Regions:
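Nuclease-adjacent, charged terminal/linker segments that flank catalytic cores
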Residues: 1-114
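Hydrophobic, aromatic-enriched interface-forming segments
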Residues: 113-131
């Protein structure tokens, strides 16, 4: 298991941290949202970069499966690992997300979309805690 910096973030915003590992993967960590979301990791993969199943095994997953409808409602594409689309966003094992991008603009658009989605999920997940 690789170790990641773990900094609790304020509840009102999503703070992203960018980490590039030795294989050239970029990880955007959104910080600590709450115990239900645990730590959501977004992996950015340049277009055409091959990622094998073995490459996924190091990444920790979390319990996002129950929020799939929310994610779909925000227009994000999720496909099983075996059927990743180069321009899509992939949910792995009901947990972490992979974003495949084709350009800097495309990458930024997908990150912004994902951030909005995370905030929507977070608000939904915490609505009973913060009234």
């Amino acid at each position: 298991k690789r170790k990641r910096p773990h900094q609790p973030a304020p509840f009102t915003r999503v703070r992203a941290q960018r980490i590039t590992d030795k294989e050239g993967f970029q990880t955007v960590s959104t910080g600590y949202l709450d115990y239900m979301l645990d730590e959501l990791e977004i992996f950015l993969i340049p277009d055409k970069k091959l990622v094998t199943d073995a490459g996924y095994t190091e990444f920790r997953t979390n319990a996002l499966a129950e929020y799939q409808d929310t994610i779909h409602a925000h227009g994000l594409v999720m496909v099983p690992v075996k059927q990743t689309k180069e321009d899509g966003i992939t949910l792995i094992q009901g947990g972490d997300l992979l974003i495949h991008y084709t350009s800097e603009n495309d990458k930024q658009e997908k990150i912004d979309k994902m951030r909005a989605c995370i905030l929507a999920i977070y608000k939904d997940a915490t609505k009973d805690f913060f009234r």
